[in-house]
């Protein structure tokens, strides 16, 4: 039998657009999302709004925070949080979802969100190690450049059913954010 890992290996070769609107607005969030067939999206808009509002409340954003959003999909949580954050970095394994996230940021005029393709357990540790090499961190170092990525204020994770990989969890702890919001 096939394992869950096989789901990501299979690509949809050809799709035919039969009938739908090209985009829609998630009620209550003020963000318009375009979604491709290969991308995941929460299908219950009322509960999605409650979920994102709860995540925002737990994140405690004031507009000055740097945020990592792991397993970000098409950027739904990232873009929602970007309205109250200084900078948001999203990571997702599905390339088409990251394309959707970037397009959704443009569509909504959001400039404080960046998105990266890859496994969270590979991308986050890689950024962390590279940032440590690039900038020496001390208590009096101003939060600029790589430091924003190295020492985020908040990390939000909305992982698949299997949960977060141990390497990802270890890196999150090493980054010492003020808050981790696990959706």
Language-model-detected regions and their locations in the chain:
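Rossmann-like S-adenosyl-L-methionine
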Residues: 2, 6-183
């Amino acid at each position: 039998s096939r394992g869950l890992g096989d789901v990501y290996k299979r690509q949809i070769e050809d799709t035919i657009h039969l009938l739908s609107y090209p985009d829609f607005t998630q009620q209550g969030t003020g963000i318009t999302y375009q979604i491709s067939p290969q991308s995941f999206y929460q299908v219950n808009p009322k509960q999605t709004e409650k979920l994102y509002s709860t995540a925002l409340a737990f994140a405690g954003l004031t507009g000055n925070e740097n945020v990592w959003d792991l397993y970000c999909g098409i950027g739904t949580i990232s873009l929602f949080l970007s309205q109250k954050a200084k900078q948001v970095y999203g990571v997702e394994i599905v390339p088409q979802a990251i394309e959707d996230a970037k397009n959704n940021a443009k569509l909504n005029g959001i400039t404080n969100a960046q998105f990266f393709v890859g496994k969270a357990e590979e991308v986050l540790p890689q950024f962390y190690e590279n940032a440590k090499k690039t900038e020496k961190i001390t208590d009096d170092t101003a939060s600029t450049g790589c430091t924003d990525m190295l020492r985020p204020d908040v990390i939000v994770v909305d992982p698949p059913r299997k949960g977060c990989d141990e390497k990802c969890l270890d890196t999150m702890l090493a980054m010492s954010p003020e808050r981790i919001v696990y959706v």
